[in-house]
Amino acid sequence: MSGFGDRLAGATARRGPLCLGIDPHPELLRAWGLGTDAAGLAGFSDICVAAFAGFAVVKPQVAFFEAYGSAGYAVLERTIAALRESGVLVLADAKRGDIGSTMAAYASAWAGDSPLAADAVTASPYLGFGSLQPLLDTAREHDRGVFVLAATSNPEGASVQCAVAPGAIPGRTVAQAIVDAAAEVNAGAARGSVGVVVGATLSAPPDVSALNGPVLVPGVGAQGGRPEALAGLGGARRGQLLPAVSREVLRAGPDVAALRAAAERMRDAVAYLGENP
């Protein structure tokens, strides 16, 4: 199997640079006429799988599945498998982060041979970037990707992410240090498999020009990020940004055709970001 960075580049070149979210929020379940239980969760997920087949990347939000306990995890496992069988790259939005053996256990679950393992997973570096090493190692061994939270759009994040660590290069924020650490992991690869997460609505994003890896850009659409305003975010090159959209598309459901049409409109809106628009 080729590395995740290569698989992602191929998928977005063929199918467009867009990541579609599966976020089964209780309000959406009710809006779709589904129950706020495991059966409703399964119905919601099945509709999304049918609508999003043929797109490049789909991102299930793990927390909404966890809320239903073991039944929710069973639905998540089935959803990941169905998406991958349809040729879609799956990014598990789990945001895991810990140290030592606990991080290694998370790595086995989300980047090893577990039924939960997707093509890539999100991770939190705020116990120190080095704490992610077990995950980075496991992902590399299994040709999977990792997207590390760097600069998020929520206002609470700035107090940590925009801070300058004592002894750091003058002006280099914590978020920039995370991007730079990811770049070191990607060094020497044709296409790195360690990406970062940078919010679409940030006025001063970190510099990702030397990352040599993908940049997941959540917050497009309903959360305020404008598809037409993403070019060059953080110095990104063409083909590097992967905009992520959830609510803007999901509110078009539950009809599969309507949901797919909404996803296609968003894909068209961000097509200019690809390497071969």
UniProtKB/Swiss-Prot annotation:
Keywords: Decarboxylase, Lyase, Pyrimidine biosynthesis
Positions of the catalytic residues: 95 (proton donor)
Pfam entry (one): OMPdecase
Pathways per UniProt: Pyrimidine metabolism; UMP biosynthesis via de novo pathway; UMP from orotate: step 2/2
MF GO annotations: orotidine-5'-phosphate decarboxylase activity
Top-level taxon of origin: Bacteria
Enzyme Commission no: 4.1.1.23
Gene3D superfamilies assigned to the protein according to its UniProt record, in alphabetical order: Aldolase class I
CDD domains referenced in this protein's UniProt entry, alphabetically: OMP_decarboxylase_like
GO BP term, example: 'de novo' pyrimidine nucleobase biosynthetic process
HAMAP family to which the protein is assigned, alphabetical: OMPdecase_type2
PANTHER family given in the database record: OROTIDINE 5'-PHOSPHATE DECARBOXYLASE (PTHR43375:SF1)
Family, similarity comment: Belongs to the OMP decarboxylase family. Type 2 subfamily.
UniProt protein name: Orotidine 5'-phosphate decarboxylase
Naturally occurring in which organism (per UniProt): Mycolicibacterium vanbaalenii (strain DSM 7251 / JCM 13017 / BCRC 16820 / KCTC 9966 / NRRL B-24157 / PYR-1) (Mycobacterium vanbaalenii)
Primary gene name: pyrF
